[in-house]
């Protein structure tokens, strides 16, 4: 059998960590049923990613597969088409080590009900949970992209916006969910938890304002 182009130990550790993280995400209600996908970089050319159609509340190590940076399988399993949105981030920045994508109630309602092309979070203490933010007197603008089945085209739009400096920690897809990334999986989960909490707060504030 030919040697794999990535460490099996690194893959096994990544699969274990992604499965455990996925169960935490599911328990918070951010990834119902088979929605969402999660990944972790294995090396320069490969990443571990959740397989398509897996129930996130029952996620196991065997539900994780390897793909190359073009989103093509490097182990058994079927990757989600959205894998290209993960690999775009890994190709864009070699420091990115983990990507988490969720389908929460708050992100869906906010992006479906309000037609703006971005959501701004400002003045929240919890913003300091995000990598590189040290003051609550900060403003985070999260771009909202239109949902599409043409994932390659969407990945190209995201890449263009990132190269223009318009995306820092996360982006949203209308009616679809949130993407965030970081230099390791625990930090990525921390950012996800902060962002999902802030989006839920923002939704409630807008309801109270009647806006």
UniProtKB/Swiss-Prot annotation:
Show the disulfide pairing. Answer: none
Sorted alphabetically, the Gene Ontology BP terms of this entry are: L-methionine salvage from methylthioadenosine; monosaccharide metabolic process
Q: Which GO terms describe its molecular function?
A: methylthioribulose 1-phosphate dehydratase activity; zinc ion binding
Q: What is the required cofactor set for this protein?
A: Zn(2+)
> Which positions bind Zn(2+)?
101, 103
Keywords per UniProt = Amino-acid biosynthesis, Lyase, Metal-binding, Methionine biosynthesis, Zinc
Q: Does the keyword Zinc apply?
A: yes
Is Lyase set as a keyword in this record?
yes
Kindly state which reaction or reactions the protein catalyses.
5-(methylsulfanyl)-D-ribulose 1-phosphate = 5-methylsulfanyl-2,3-dioxopentyl phosphate + H2O
Q: Name one GO cellular component term.
A: cytoplasm
Pathway(s) this gene product operates in, as recorded in its UniProt entry: Amino-acid biosynthesis; L-methionine biosynthesis via salvage pathway; L-methionine from S-methyl-5-thio-alpha-D-ribose 1-phosphate: step 2/6
The note on cofactor binding and number reads: Binds 1 zinc ion per subunit.
- A Pfam family annotated for this chain is Aldolase_II
Segments traversing the membrane: none
Outline what the protein does.
Answer: Catalyzes the dehydration of methylthioribulose-1-phosphate (MTRu-1-P) into 2,3-diketo-5-methylthiopentyl-1-phosphate (DK-MTP-1-P).
Family named by the database record: Belongs to the aldolase class II family. MtnB subfamily.
Query: Mind telling me which PANTHER family this protein's record contains?
Result: METHYLTHIORIBULOSE-1-PHOSPHATE DEHYDRATASE
Kindly provide the name given to this protein in its UniProt entry: Methylthioribulose-1-phosphate dehydratase
Per the record, the gene is mtnB
């Amino acid at each position: 059998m030919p040697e794999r182009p990535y460490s099996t130990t690194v893959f096994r550790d990544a699969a274990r960590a992604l499965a455990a993280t996925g169960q935490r995400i599911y328990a918070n209600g951010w990834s119902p049923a088979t929605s969402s996908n999660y990944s972790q970089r294995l090396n320069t050319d490969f990443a571990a990613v959740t397989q398509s159609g897996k129930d996130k509340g029952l996620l196991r190590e065997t539900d994780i597969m390897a793909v190359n940076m073009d989103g093509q399988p490097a182990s058994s399993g079927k990757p989600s088409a959205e894998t290209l949105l993960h690999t775009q981030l890994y190709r864009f920045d070699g420091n990115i080590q983990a990507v988490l994508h969720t389908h929460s109630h708050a992100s869906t309602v906010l992006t479906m009900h309000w037609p703006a092309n971005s959501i701004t979070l400002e003045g929240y203490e919890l913003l300091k949970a995000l990598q590189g933010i040290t003051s609550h007197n900060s403003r985070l603008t999260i771009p909202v992209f239109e949902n599409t089945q043409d994932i390659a085209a969407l990945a190209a739009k995201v890449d263009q916006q990132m190269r223009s400096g318009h995306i820092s920690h996360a982006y949203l897809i209308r009616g679809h969910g949130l993407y965030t990334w970081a230099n390791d999986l625990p930090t990525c989960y921390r950012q996800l938890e902060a962002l999902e909490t802030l989006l839920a707060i923002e939704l409630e504030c807008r309801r109270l304002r009647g806006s």
